Design a protein with these regions (language model features):
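A short acidic, glycine-rich active-site loop
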Residues: 79-92
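Charged docking surfaces used in two-component/phosphorelay signaling
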Residues: 112-120
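A short helix-to-beta-strand connector/capping loop
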Residues: 101-109
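Small/aliphatic-rich secondary-structure junction motif
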Residues: 2, 20-77
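Conserved beta-strand positions in the Rossmann-like core of class I SAM-dependent methyltransferases
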Residues: 60, 109, 164
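Gly/Ser-rich helix-loop-strand patches that form or flank binding pockets
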Residues: 1-21, 123-169
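Short glycine/serine/threonine/alanine-rich loop segments
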Residues: 51, 57-58, 106, 130, ...
């Protein structure tokens, strides 16, 4: 801990350091990479796989299904069919990614998330003891980013572990 903080922290036992704890050499043991199966997430998947391989880390490949905007107009049967189709497609795509990771000697698992992506990613990372979150980003700025929101910026702001954002081309 920096020497400057010691007198401050010692004067009030309720105060906590704002400097995140660092591990020697910062070796990652559990890496979570989130994908939405778009081109923006491909470079993040590649980088996460590379880091997992280098660190002999476990790779958690996560996907969060988002509900369709027309949800209020769907019948219960239509919603159930849509949800089942989305889950099946995600399982197939993540299954292929897991096979690729295992071919490269990386222990990989699927992590199915539900709810808003940023909330689900942060919560899963905390519950599972993730050392690093890797996210793809589209690189939009200004008004475009404001309109669309940014899962990556929300995760960066709220995660308790390091977050690596990988910009797509």
């Amino acid at each position: 801990m920096p020497e400057v903080l010691n007198p401050i922290l010692e004067s009030d036992p309720k105060m906590q350091p704002v400097v995140p704890a660092q591990r020697p050499g910062q070796i990652y043991r559990r890496i979570l990479v989130a994908t939405d199966f778009t081109a923006a997430s491909t470079p993040a998947l590649k980088q996460a796989l590379k880091l997992a391989k280098q660190n002999h880390a476990e790779l958690l490949i996560a996907h969060s299904s988002t509900e369709p905007a027309s949800l209020s107009f769907m019948s219960a049967d239509s919603y159930d069919a849509w949800e089942k189709q989305c889950r099946t497609e995600a399982e197939q795509k993540i299954g292929a990614l897991i096979q690729q990771a295992r071919k490269e000697g990386v222990k990989a698992h699927m992590l199915e998330l539900s709810g808003l992506a940023d909330d689900a990613i942060v919560e899963a990372a905390e519950q599972l003891g993730v050392d690093l979150i890797v996210l793809g980003t589209h690189g939009r700025r200004g008004f475009s980013r404001f309109l669309l929101g940014s899962v990556a910026s929300q995760v960066v702001a709220r995660a308790r572990c390091p977050v690596l954002t990988v910009r797509s081309s």
